[in-house]
Regions:
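Extended acidic/polar, glycine-enriched regions
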Residues: 148, 210-301, 695-701, 710, ...
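Non-catalytic, glycine-rich low-complexity segments
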Residues: 30-46, 58-101, 112-116, 154-221, ...
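Extended substrate-binding grooves/exosites of carbohydrate-active enzymes
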Residues: 43, 61-73, 77, 178, ...
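Short, hydrophobic beta-strand segments
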Residues: 143-145, 255-264, 693-699, 792-811
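Accessory beta-strand-rich segments of carbohydrate-active enzymes
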Residues: 33-35, 42-45, 84, 89-191, ...
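Beta-strand-rich structural segments
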Residues: 209-213, 228, 278, 661-665, ...
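Short flexible loop/turn segments that cap and initiate beta-strands
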Residues: 52-55, 221-226, 239, 268-274, ...
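Edge beta-strands of extracellular beta-sandwich domains
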Residues: 288-293, 713-724, 826-834
């Protein structure tokens, strides 16, 4: 009984401290309140909404995160173009009231944005507080000097995404990540002010905690900083306390702790400790902070690639853009979790955040699920790729933005590399690329070299020096991790490589040059930071399958009127390769640490190889709606221990037509194909460089079946049957119990099937959805890259037999019913509960 009571007290103490630090509960000197709900919103091209007296009563009332562009129609004339998703930009305004009854003169308030795209300006009581251009960075503004601490305050936020195009892909528009209202005293832990530097050695986890305390009070303060490391059983496994004299404007305090016999963070067991920091004055807690801590060892080796905790692991990664399909850019934890879990089930163990700092929720997920991360800063530096991109702001903001990315993210154990850029144009040896005067260059780089030294033959020209400057910023705030960049110029003459600032050589594509890496980059670890760029449309197959269909060059537009790309692994962009070709190189190159495939999911924008009406990508292993393409199963057969037997394509063709059937498999010696019971032959992967088997057969209605055998025994079977006339709708939710929090989602797969339940692979029926209960339809999709149907709707046309509807729970517990109907189709209703 005493042990049980002690455990209860220990758990209660931990939970109370965690709540105090994590949420900074209301009523304390320090508060951290989620401030998403109850904003007024409108598209407005002038600046009148900045005025406190502006009447916003007719504006729409909504909750954040919010992406206004995803709610609109696609159009060829939107200035973002097809690469930007053919959706509009504009200026959006958000307004909200903050009523204070604060008699404490030392209280300070800040508004924190996890992300808003882009050019965000914040006004308080008609006064401009500040502006932040970069649409992917987290930032805060101190509201204190502008507030009425007794009474009403008007917060107005302008998000200006009117200058288009400013990106090579769809970014969304608006305050698309979470917002927090922060309250503190005039002595506090700096934002992102606790840094953990860890080392695991001889069975001990050494943890150095560096904590920056800000002092805005105008006098020295005597404080105690108390820090603890907790395990998952709510036990303190390391702790320290230090009394310090905090002077203005800030003081750094360091404490060394030791975790005995630590449990290591790994892919299979991502163990997380919790670090709490309390700042006390006169025995009263005046501020606190908490974060998760993972203890591990990370190593990039020149000859053997990547090691985690001493284990040699191939990085099986994907690149992901930030949009969530039909939900747009507005962050949602359930949607993110679905994406990451689908990738993990395929065998993915790493994500490259392309090409910008991600939402904090993605990093939290990767920490908790055991997924490695390459955290990337910029897609452009001084040289722009679109007329209004980040290059316009780089000179003024790169140091602040890069610093803030590293400060925000450096305690995440999932992050194994920082990337300071993707395919930046500064790779090439063109000194005048910057368009900057020499005096500006000197200011930018703190470089006093004369103009004659900046010759084209100089190995330390502006672009190399800029690379060094960026890397130096990263190392200043995180000396523990290596630095890379995604480079599509793979010769040693690349200015980024010549700088010597990159710890890991990163190639984007150019798999044929991988063999030259040891000679060209001696002593440097190597990673394929971006690969493949295969082009596929789920459900479409172009034959013969042994012909490779490459996208023509830039000057020869791809004009296939179908706007479809083959889902055999036989279609790719001219700069890329097929999935099997690239994986074969990565798999059989020991010094290659791994790869990041472009991309895990299709994304809105960049519809290579087509233009409008195509408006989303063809690169993904999973389509925009979240339906896997066939190559998903090739990776699953190679990257996981799951038994895989995947026969494709479907079995609905013209009688007598010649059809190529492929099969991905593992854990078997051979696979035999039967058409209506008649053997079409046994196939085997003849060596370790083959990843599928295939048959060329004549179609006849009925059934195509594969039988897998190992040691002569049947270990698996799969059949594709000829579907009849579309008969009814089948609904399959990924979750049937939701949280009644206004954000919880169920992704419901919708299939058109025949009377026997076989998918009708050519079905294009329009499906209408209706809901009862406290819920709404958050979005609809079908995976088509060229459909111009709105994402925000209550109907969707099937695409190769499938579509998707996303149900979002309201804020009241409810029994939700979703009904799907279509002409000449039997409807279906499913029940979803929110509680």
């Amino acid at each position: 009984m005493r042990k049980s009571t002690f455990s209860l007290v220990r758990r209660s103490s931990f939970v109370l401290l965690l709540l105090l630090c994590l949420y900074r509960l209301e009523g304390h000197a320090f508060e951290r309140n989620l401030w998403d709900d109850g904003w007024r919103f409108a598209i407005c091209q002038d600046d009148s909404p900045q005025q406190s007296v502006f009447d916003d009563s007719a504006w729409r009332l909504l909750d954040l995160p919010h992406d206004w562009a995803i709610e609109e129609d696609f159009h060829a004339l939107h200035p973002s173009g097809a690469n930007g998703g053919a959706l509009p930009g504009g200026k959006g305004w958000y307004r909200k009231h903050l009523v204070l009854q604060d008699k404490d003169a030392s209280s300070r308030y800040a508004l924190h944005f996890d992300g808003a795209y882009m050019n965000t300006s914040v006004y308080v009581n008609s006064q401009l507080v500040g502006t932040r251009p970069y649409g992917f960075i987290s930032f805060s503004f101190d509201l204190t000097p502008y507030l009425n601490k007794q009474g009403d305050n008007v917060i107005a936020v302008k998000v200006d995404n009117s200058q288009q195009p400013n990106s090579r892909w769809y970014t969304g528009c608006g305050i698309y990540r979470h917002v927090y209202l922060m309250k503190s005293t005039d002595v506090r832990i700096a934002q992102w002010g606790v840094q953990a530097i860890t080392e695991v050695k001889k069975g001990v986890g050494n943890v150095m905690l560096n904590t920056q305390i800000e002092n805005l009070s105008g006098r020295n303060r005597r404080l105690i900083v108390r820090q603890k490391v907790w395990n998952k059983n709510h036990e303190v496994v390391a702790q320290g306390s230090k009394a310090i004299n905090v002077v203005a404007p800030a003081t750094m305090v360091s404490q060394q702790m030791r975790v005995q016999k630590p449990k290591l963070w790994s892919l299979s067991s991502p163990y997380l400790y919790t670090v709490t920091t309390e700042v006390l004055e006169n025995n009263r807690v005046i501020d606190c902070d908490t974060f998760n801590l993972g203890l591990h060892t990370v190593k990039f080796d020149v000859q053997k690639g990547f090691f985690l905790n001493g284990e040699n692991i191939k990085i099986n990664g994907v690149c992901l853009h930030g949009d969530l399909g039909c939900l747009g850019a507005a962050i949602n934890e359930d949607a993110l979790h679905r994406q990451v879990k689908m990738m993990m089930e395929m065998g993915v163990n790493a994500i490259r955040c392309s090409h910008n700092p991600p939402a904090p929720e993605l990093l939290n997920l990767c920490d908790s699920l055991g997924v490695l991360v390459v955290d990337e800063s910029f897609d452009s530096w001084l040289q722009g790729k679109t007329p209004y991109d980040y290059s316009l702001y780089f000179k003024s903001w790169f140091e602040r933005d890069l610093r803030d990315m590293v400060l925000r993210d450096r305690n995440h154990p999932s992050i194994i590399l920082w990337s300071i850029g993707n395919e930046v144009l500064e790779q090439w040896n063109k000194v005048n690329n910057s368009g900057m005067a020499l005096e500006d260059v000197n200011i930018l780089l703190n470089n006093t070299r004369d103009k004659s030294a900046l010759s084209q033959g100089d190995t330390l020209n502006l672009n190399s020096k800029l690379t060094q400057a960026l890397a130096a910023i990263v190392r200043r705030y995180d000396p523990t991790r290596m630095i890379t960049a995604g480079c599509n110029e793979v010769s040693p003459n690349n200015n980024l490589f010549k700088s010597g600032a990159l710890d890991v050589i990163g190639f984007n594509y150019h798999q044929k040059k991988v063999k030259d890496v040891p000679q060209n980059f001696p002593g440097k670890p190597f990673l394929m930071t971006e690969t493949v760029s295969a082009l596929q449309t789920r459900g479409y197959y172009k034959m013969p399958s042994d012909s490779l269909f490459r996208m023509p060059g830039k000057k020869r537009p791809f004009t296939d009127p179908t706007f479809l790309c083959s889902s055999y692994d036989n279609s790719c962009a001219y700069w890329g390769s097929t999935h099997e070709q690239t994986w074969d190189v990565v798999k059989h190159t020991p010094y290659c640490a791994g790869q990041f495939i472009w991309t895990g999911f299709d994304y809105i924008g960049e519809p290579t190889p087509f233009n409008f009406p195509a408006r989303s990508s063809y690169f993904g292993i999973v389509d925009l709606a979240g339906f896997p393409k066939d190559c998903y199963y090739m990776y699953q057969s190679e990257w996981t221990d799951k038994p895989v037997l995947h026969l494709f394509p479907h079995w609905n063709w013209i009688e007598g037509q010649t059809i190529d059937l492929w099969c991905y498999y593992n854990q078997a010696d051979e696979v035999e194909l039967f058409i209506n019971g008649k053997s079409q032959g046994v196939r085997q992967k003849r060596n370790d460089h083959e990843y599928h088997v295939a048959w060329r057969v004549t179609f006849e209605p009925g059934e195509a079946r594969v039988v897998a055998r190992k040691n002569g025994k049947v270990v698996g079977e799969q059949a594709r049957k000829t579907a009849g006339t579309p008969h009814h709708i089948r609904l399959t939710p990924n979750r049937q119990v939701l949280k009644a929090n206004g954000r919880s989602l169920s992704f419901v797969s919708v299939e058109v099937v025949d009377k026997d339940g076989n998918l009708c692979p050519w079905a294009e029926n329009n499906i209408h959805f209706s809901l009862s209960g406290d819920a709404k339809i958050a979005g609809v999709d079908n995976g088509s890259p060229f459909s111009l149907e709105r994402f925000q709707a209550n109907e969707r046309r099937a695409f190769f037999g499938k579509c998707l509807v996303v149900v979002q729970a309201g804020k009241k517990p409810s029994n939700i019913q979703l009904t799907a109907k279509g002409v000449d189709l039997a409807p279906q209703t499913i029940n979803i509960k929110s509680e």
